[in-house]
Protein backbone atom coordinates (compact mmCIF):
# COMPACT_ATOMS: atom_id res chain seq x y z
CA UNK A 1 0.00 0.00 0.00
CA UNK A 2 1.26 3.48 -0.88
CA UNK A 3 0.31 6.61 1.06
CA UNK A 4 1.56 10.15 0.70
CA UNK A 5 1.14 13.32 2.71
CA UNK A 6 -1.34 15.73 1.14
CA UNK A 7 0.31 19.03 0.28
CA UNK A 8 -2.25 21.56 -0.94
CA UNK A 9 -1.10 23.56 -3.94
CA UNK A 10 -1.86 27.28 -3.73
CA UNK A 11 -1.02 28.12 -7.34
CA UNK A 12 -1.14 25.71 -10.26
CA UNK A 13 -3.96 23.17 -10.46
CA UNK A 14 -2.46 19.77 -9.66
CA UNK A 15 -3.65 16.22 -9.07
CA UNK A 16 -1.90 13.58 -7.01
CA UNK A 17 -2.38 9.96 -5.93
CA UNK A 18 -2.25 9.96 -2.13
CA UNK A 19 -3.16 6.32 -1.49
CA UNK A 20 -2.89 3.16 -3.58
CA UNK A 21 -3.31 -0.47 -2.64
CA UNK A 22 -4.24 -3.89 -4.01
CA UNK A 23 -6.57 -5.67 -1.59
CA UNK A 24 -6.70 -8.71 -3.89
CA UNK A 25 -6.17 -9.58 -7.54
CA UNK A 26 -9.71 -8.37 -8.25
CA UNK A 27 -9.92 -5.39 -5.93
CA UNK A 28 -7.71 -2.33 -6.31
CA UNK A 29 -8.14 0.96 -4.47
CA UNK A 30 -6.83 4.44 -5.21
CA UNK A 31 -7.39 7.86 -3.64
CA UNK A 32 -6.61 11.05 -5.53
CA UNK A 33 -6.71 14.78 -4.83
CA UNK A 34 -7.11 17.72 -7.18
CA UNK A 35 -6.43 21.27 -5.99
CA UNK A 36 -6.75 24.21 -5.78
CA UNK A 37 -10.23 24.63 -7.24
CA UNK A 38 -12.58 27.60 -7.16
CA UNK A 39 -15.81 27.27 -5.23
CA UNK A 40 -18.21 24.93 -7.06
CA UNK A 41 -15.61 23.45 -9.43
CA UNK A 42 -14.88 20.42 -7.24
CA UNK A 43 -18.49 19.27 -7.35
CA UNK A 44 -18.70 19.81 -11.13
CA UNK A 45 -15.57 17.75 -11.76
CA UNK A 46 -16.40 15.14 -9.12
CA UNK A 47 -19.87 14.36 -10.50
CA UNK A 48 -18.63 14.20 -14.10
CA UNK A 49 -15.67 11.99 -13.20
CA UNK A 50 -17.78 9.58 -11.16
CA UNK A 51 -20.25 9.11 -14.01
CA UNK A 52 -17.43 8.67 -16.52
CA UNK A 53 -15.64 6.16 -14.28
CA UNK A 54 -18.77 4.05 -13.80
CA UNK A 55 -20.26 4.32 -17.27
CA UNK A 56 -17.72 5.34 -19.90
CA UNK A 57 -14.83 2.90 -19.42
CA UNK A 58 -14.83 -0.22 -21.56
CA UNK A 59 -14.21 -3.65 -20.08
CA UNK A 60 -13.76 -7.18 -21.42
CA UNK A 61 -15.95 -10.11 -20.43
CA UNK A 62 -17.45 -13.40 -21.61
CA UNK A 63 -20.73 -12.78 -23.44
CA UNK A 64 -21.58 -16.26 -24.75
CA UNK A 65 -20.82 -19.92 -24.01
CA UNK A 66 -21.48 -22.98 -26.15
CA UNK A 67 -21.31 -26.67 -25.30
CA UNK A 68 -22.63 -29.68 -27.17
CA UNK A 69 -25.55 -31.79 -25.95
CA UNK A 70 -26.90 -29.27 -23.47
CA UNK A 71 -30.72 -29.24 -23.76
CA UNK A 72 -31.30 -26.00 -21.85
CA UNK A 73 -29.63 -23.52 -19.50
CA UNK A 74 -31.01 -25.06 -16.31
CA UNK A 75 -30.09 -28.65 -17.13
CA UNK A 76 -27.46 -30.69 -15.31
CA UNK A 77 -24.66 -32.78 -16.77
CA UNK A 78 -23.72 -36.14 -15.28
CA UNK A 79 -20.29 -35.89 -13.70
CA UNK A 80 -20.42 -32.12 -13.14
CA UNK A 81 -21.37 -30.80 -9.73
CA UNK A 82 -22.78 -27.49 -11.02
CA UNK A 83 -25.76 -26.97 -13.30
CA UNK A 84 -25.26 -25.28 -16.66
CA UNK A 85 -26.74 -22.08 -15.21
CA UNK A 86 -24.25 -22.07 -12.32
CA UNK A 87 -21.35 -22.56 -14.73
CA UNK A 88 -22.58 -19.60 -16.80
CA UNK A 89 -22.78 -17.45 -13.67
CA UNK A 90 -19.20 -18.39 -12.76
CA UNK A 91 -18.01 -17.55 -16.28
CA UNK A 92 -19.72 -14.17 -15.97
CA UNK A 93 -17.46 -13.31 -13.01
CA UNK A 94 -14.17 -13.93 -14.85
CA UNK A 95 -12.15 -10.70 -15.09
CA UNK A 96 -10.00 -9.99 -18.15
CA UNK A 97 -7.43 -7.32 -18.92
CA UNK A 98 -7.14 -6.57 -22.64
CA UNK A 99 -6.97 -3.99 -25.40
CA UNK A 100 -8.94 -6.02 -27.92
CA UNK A 101 -11.62 -4.46 -30.09
CA UNK A 102 -14.58 -6.43 -31.35
CA UNK A 103 -15.22 -10.07 -30.53
CA UNK A 104 -12.73 -12.89 -29.95
CA UNK A 105 -13.09 -16.59 -29.34
CA UNK A 106 -11.77 -18.63 -26.41
CA UNK A 107 -12.31 -22.15 -25.13
CA UNK A 108 -12.13 -24.60 -22.25
CA UNK A 109 -11.38 -28.27 -22.85
CA UNK A 110 -10.52 -30.41 -19.80
CA UNK A 111 -11.02 -33.93 -18.49
CA UNK A 112 -12.12 -34.84 -14.97
CA UNK A 113 -12.08 -35.54 -12.20
CA UNK A 114 -10.73 -32.09 -11.32
CA UNK A 115 -11.63 -28.49 -10.56
CA UNK A 116 -12.03 -26.16 -13.53
CA UNK A 117 -10.72 -22.62 -12.99
CA UNK A 118 -10.02 -19.54 -15.10
CA UNK A 119 -6.53 -20.90 -15.69
CA UNK A 120 -8.09 -23.51 -18.00
CA UNK A 121 -9.42 -20.86 -20.39
CA UNK A 122 -7.48 -20.80 -23.66
CA UNK A 123 -7.69 -17.16 -24.74
CA UNK A 124 -6.10 -14.97 -27.46
CA UNK A 125 -2.68 -13.41 -26.72
CA UNK A 126 -4.31 -9.97 -26.45
CA UNK A 127 -6.43 -11.13 -23.50
CA UNK A 128 -5.00 -11.68 -20.01
CA UNK A 129 -6.90 -13.34 -17.18
CA UNK A 130 -6.58 -11.22 -14.03
CA UNK A 131 -7.19 -14.00 -11.49
CA UNK A 132 -6.48 -17.51 -12.80
CA UNK A 133 -7.81 -19.08 -9.58
CA UNK A 134 -11.42 -18.02 -10.22
CA UNK A 135 -13.62 -21.09 -9.87
CA UNK A 136 -15.79 -22.32 -12.77
CA UNK A 137 -16.89 -25.92 -12.11
CA UNK A 138 -16.05 -29.25 -10.47
CA UNK A 139 -15.81 -32.45 -12.54
CA UNK A 140 -16.51 -35.42 -10.27
CA UNK A 141 -16.08 -38.16 -12.89
CA UNK A 142 -13.65 -38.89 -15.76
CA UNK A 143 -15.62 -36.97 -18.37
CA UNK A 144 -14.64 -34.35 -20.95
CA UNK A 145 -15.87 -30.79 -20.65
CA UNK A 146 -15.49 -28.60 -23.73
CA UNK A 147 -16.91 -25.08 -23.84
CA UNK A 148 -16.55 -22.52 -26.61
CA UNK A 149 -16.51 -18.94 -25.33
CA UNK A 150 -17.09 -15.55 -26.88
CA UNK A 151 -15.12 -12.67 -25.36
CA UNK A 152 -16.15 -9.10 -26.10
CA UNK A 153 -15.09 -5.60 -25.15
CA UNK A 154 -17.92 -3.21 -24.33
CA UNK A 155 -19.06 -0.83 -21.64
CA UNK A 156 -21.80 -0.84 -19.03
CA UNK A 157 -24.28 -3.64 -18.39
CA UNK A 158 -25.98 -5.55 -21.19
CA UNK A 159 -28.79 -7.98 -20.41
CA UNK A 160 -28.92 -11.13 -22.51
CA UNK A 161 -31.73 -11.41 -25.05
CA UNK A 162 -34.17 -14.34 -24.60
CA UNK A 163 -33.67 -15.85 -28.06
CA UNK A 164 -33.86 -19.49 -29.02
CA UNK A 165 -30.32 -20.90 -29.35
CA UNK A 166 -30.56 -24.20 -31.18
CA UNK A 167 -26.78 -24.42 -31.70
CA UNK A 168 -26.21 -25.04 -27.99
CA UNK A 169 -24.89 -21.56 -27.21
CA UNK A 170 -26.12 -19.47 -24.31
CA UNK A 171 -25.76 -15.70 -23.85
CA UNK A 172 -24.32 -14.31 -20.63
CA UNK A 173 -25.27 -10.97 -19.08
CA UNK A 174 -22.31 -8.75 -19.97
CA UNK A 175 -20.92 -6.70 -17.09
CA UNK A 176 -18.26 -4.56 -18.77
CA UNK A 177 -17.56 -2.30 -15.81
CA UNK A 178 -13.90 -2.25 -14.67
CA UNK A 179 -14.71 0.32 -11.95
CA UNK A 180 -16.60 -1.25 -9.05
CA UNK A 181 -17.28 2.00 -7.26
CA UNK A 182 -16.26 5.66 -7.25
CA UNK A 183 -16.86 8.37 -4.66
CA UNK A 184 -15.89 12.01 -4.40
CA UNK A 185 -15.74 14.40 -1.47
CA UNK A 186 -14.87 18.07 -1.13
CA UNK A 187 -12.83 19.99 1.45
CA UNK A 188 -13.13 23.78 1.52
CA UNK A 189 -10.50 26.14 2.91
CA UNK A 190 -9.84 29.87 2.99
CA UNK A 191 -12.08 32.77 3.95
CA UNK A 192 -14.62 34.93 2.15
CA UNK A 193 -13.95 35.51 -1.53
CA UNK A 194 -10.64 33.63 -1.25
CA UNK A 195 -12.38 30.33 -0.50
CA UNK A 196 -11.02 27.37 -2.46
CA UNK A 197 -11.71 23.64 -2.64
CA UNK A 198 -9.88 20.33 -2.71
CA UNK A 199 -11.48 17.42 -4.56
CA UNK A 200 -10.92 13.92 -3.15
CA UNK A 201 -11.70 11.06 -5.53
CA UNK A 202 -11.81 7.40 -4.45
CA UNK A 203 -11.78 4.61 -7.05
CA UNK A 204 -12.22 0.84 -6.64
CA UNK A 205 -11.51 -1.38 -9.68
CA UNK A 206 -11.79 -5.09 -10.46
CA UNK A 207 -8.11 -5.49 -11.42
CA UNK A 208 -8.53 -5.10 -15.18
CA UNK A 209 -7.52 -1.45 -14.67
CA UNK A 210 -5.56 0.13 -11.86
CA UNK A 211 -7.36 3.12 -10.31
CA UNK A 212 -4.83 5.45 -11.93
CA UNK A 213 -5.44 3.87 -15.35
CA UNK A 214 -9.19 4.14 -14.83
CA UNK A 215 -8.87 7.81 -13.88
CA UNK A 216 -6.86 8.52 -17.02
CA UNK A 217 -9.27 6.58 -19.25
CA UNK A 218 -12.32 8.33 -17.81
CA UNK A 219 -10.63 11.72 -18.25
CA UNK A 220 -9.81 10.95 -21.88
CA UNK A 221 -13.39 9.85 -22.54
CA UNK A 222 -14.74 13.08 -21.06
CA UNK A 223 -12.38 15.10 -23.24
CA UNK A 224 -13.53 13.18 -26.32
CA UNK A 225 -17.16 14.01 -25.51
CA UNK A 226 -16.42 17.74 -25.61
CA UNK A 227 -14.14 17.74 -28.68
CA UNK A 228 -17.00 18.22 -31.19
CA UNK A 229 -17.83 21.58 -29.59
CA UNK A 230 -14.21 22.72 -29.97
CA UNK A 231 -13.94 21.42 -33.52
CA UNK A 232 -17.14 23.20 -34.54
CA UNK A 233 -15.50 26.54 -33.76
CA UNK A 234 -12.24 25.52 -35.45
CA UNK A 235 -14.10 24.49 -38.60
CA UNK A 236 -15.79 27.90 -38.82
CA UNK A 237 -12.43 29.63 -38.52
CA UNK A 238 -10.80 27.32 -41.07
CA UNK A 239 -13.57 27.93 -43.62
CA UNK A 240 -12.93 31.68 -43.41
CA UNK A 241 -9.16 31.27 -43.63
CA UNK A 242 -9.29 28.86 -46.56
CA UNK A 243 -11.26 31.29 -48.71
CA UNK A 244 -8.12 33.39 -49.17
CA UNK A 245 -5.46 30.70 -48.93
CA UNK A 246 -3.88 28.69 -51.73
CA UNK A 247 -3.73 24.94 -51.27
CA UNK A 248 -0.24 23.85 -50.18
CA UNK A 249 1.35 20.79 -51.80
CA UNK A 250 1.15 17.57 -49.79
CA UNK A 251 4.18 16.26 -47.96
CA UNK A 252 5.40 12.79 -48.66
CA UNK A 253 4.14 10.46 -45.97
CA UNK A 254 7.60 9.95 -44.42
CA UNK A 255 8.46 13.67 -44.33
CA UNK A 256 5.02 14.53 -43.03
CA UNK A 257 5.21 12.13 -40.09
CA UNK A 258 8.77 13.25 -39.32
CA UNK A 259 7.57 16.85 -39.18
CA UNK A 260 4.66 15.90 -36.94
CA UNK A 261 7.05 14.07 -34.64
CA UNK A 262 9.21 17.19 -34.35
CA UNK A 263 6.21 19.40 -33.63
CA UNK A 264 5.04 17.01 -30.92
CA UNK A 265 8.49 16.67 -29.34
CA UNK A 266 8.22 17.19 -25.61
CA UNK A 267 4.63 15.92 -25.49
CA UNK A 268 3.89 12.32 -24.47
CA UNK A 269 2.92 10.88 -27.86
CA UNK A 270 1.58 7.76 -26.18
CA UNK A 271 -0.99 9.98 -24.46
CA UNK A 272 -2.43 11.25 -27.76
CA UNK A 273 -5.01 8.69 -28.93
CA UNK A 274 -5.96 8.33 -32.58
CA UNK A 275 -9.66 8.65 -31.76
CA UNK A 276 -8.97 12.32 -31.00
CA UNK A 277 -8.04 12.96 -34.65
CA UNK A 278 -11.49 12.60 -36.26
CA UNK A 279 -10.45 9.73 -38.49
CA UNK A 280 -13.16 8.08 -40.61
CA UNK A 281 -14.74 5.10 -38.88
CA UNK A 282 -13.36 2.53 -41.34
CA UNK A 283 -9.81 3.91 -41.09
CA UNK A 284 -10.05 4.11 -37.31
CA UNK A 285 -11.23 0.48 -37.04
CA UNK A 286 -8.45 -0.74 -39.35
CA UNK A 287 -5.82 0.94 -37.18
CA UNK A 288 -7.37 -0.39 -33.98
CA UNK A 289 -7.38 -3.95 -35.32
CA UNK A 290 -3.65 -3.55 -35.97
CA UNK A 291 -3.08 -2.41 -32.35
CA UNK A 292 -2.41 1.19 -33.38
CA UNK A 293 -4.05 3.14 -30.56
CA UNK A 294 -1.91 6.26 -30.06
CA UNK A 295 -0.02 8.79 -32.14
CA UNK A 296 3.20 7.13 -30.98
CA UNK A 297 1.99 3.82 -32.44
CA UNK A 298 1.14 5.55 -35.71
CA UNK A 299 4.46 7.41 -36.00
CA UNK A 300 6.28 4.12 -35.43
CA UNK A 301 4.88 2.75 -38.71
CA UNK A 302 6.05 3.57 -42.22
CA UNK A 303 3.77 4.01 -45.23
CA UNK A 304 4.67 0.46 -46.26
CA UNK A 305 3.68 -0.85 -42.83
CA UNK A 306 0.28 0.83 -43.04
CA UNK A 307 -0.33 -0.49 -46.55
CA UNK A 308 0.04 -4.03 -45.19
CA UNK A 309 -3.03 -3.52 -42.99
CA UNK A 310 -6.03 -5.44 -44.27
CA UNK A 311 -8.51 -3.27 -46.24
CA UNK A 312 -6.14 -0.28 -46.05
CA UNK A 313 -5.69 1.84 -49.20
CA UNK A 314 -3.25 4.53 -50.32
CA UNK A 315 -6.13 7.03 -50.07
CA UNK A 316 -6.42 6.18 -46.37
CA UNK A 317 -2.72 6.88 -45.84
CA UNK A 318 -3.00 10.28 -47.56
CA UNK A 319 -6.12 11.08 -45.54
CA UNK A 320 -4.38 10.26 -42.24
CA UNK A 321 -1.46 12.52 -43.13
CA UNK A 322 -3.80 15.33 -44.13
CA UNK A 323 -5.75 15.10 -40.87
CA UNK A 324 -2.59 15.04 -38.75
CA UNK A 325 -1.06 17.96 -40.67
CA UNK A 326 -4.21 19.97 -40.01
CA UNK A 327 -4.38 18.88 -36.37
CA UNK A 328 -0.79 19.91 -35.61
CA UNK A 329 -0.73 22.98 -37.87
CA UNK A 330 2.17 21.94 -40.07
CA UNK A 331 3.15 24.63 -42.56
UniProtKB/Swiss-Prot annotation:
Enzyme class: transferase
GO BP of this protein: DNA-templated transcription
InterPro entries per the UniProt record, alphabetical: DNA-dir_RNA_pol_insert (IPR011262), DNA-dir_RNA_pol_RpoA/D/Rpb3 (IPR011263), DNA-dir_RpoA (IPR011773), RBP11-like (IPR036603), RNAP_asu_C (IPR011260), RNApol_insert_sf (IPR036643)
Disulfide bonds: none
Region (Alpha C-terminal domain (alpha-CTD)): 268-331
Keyword Metal-binding: no
CC per GO annotation: chloroplast; DNA-directed RNA polymerase complex; mitochondrion
EC number, UniProt record: 2.7.7.6
Location within or outside the cell: Plastid, Chloroplast
Pfam families cross-referenced by the UniProt entry: RNA_pol_A_bac, RNA_pol_A_CTD, RNA_pol_L
Main location as per UniProt: plastid
Catalytic activity: RNA(n) + a ribonucleoside 5'-triphosphate = RNA(n+1) + diphosphate
SMART domains: RPOLD (SM00662)
Region (Alpha N-terminal domain (alpha-NTD)) location: 1-233
Function, as annotated: DNA-dependent RNA polymerase catalyzes the transcription of DNA into RNA using the four ribonucleoside triphosphates as substrates.
Domains: entry comment: The N-terminal domain is essential for RNAP assembly and basal transcription, whereas the C-terminal domain is involved in interaction with transcriptional regulators and with upstream promoter elements.
Oligomeric form and interacting partners: In plastids the minimal PEP RNA polymerase catalytic core is composed of four subunits: alpha, beta, beta', and beta''. When a (nuclear-encoded) sigma factor is associated with the core the holoenzyme is formed, which can initiate transcription.
Protein name per Swiss-Prot or TrEMBL: DNA-directed RNA polymerase subunit alpha
Originating organism: Illicium oligandrum
Amino acid sequence: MVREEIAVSTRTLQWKCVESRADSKRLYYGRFVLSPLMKGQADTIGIAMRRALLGEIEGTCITRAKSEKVPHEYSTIVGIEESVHEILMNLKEIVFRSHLYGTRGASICVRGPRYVTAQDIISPPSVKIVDTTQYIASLTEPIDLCIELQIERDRGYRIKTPNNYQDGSYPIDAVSMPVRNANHSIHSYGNGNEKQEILFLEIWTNGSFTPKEALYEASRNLIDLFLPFLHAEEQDINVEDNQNRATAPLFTFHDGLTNIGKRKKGIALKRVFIDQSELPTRTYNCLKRSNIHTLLDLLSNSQEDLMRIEHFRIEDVKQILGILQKRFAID
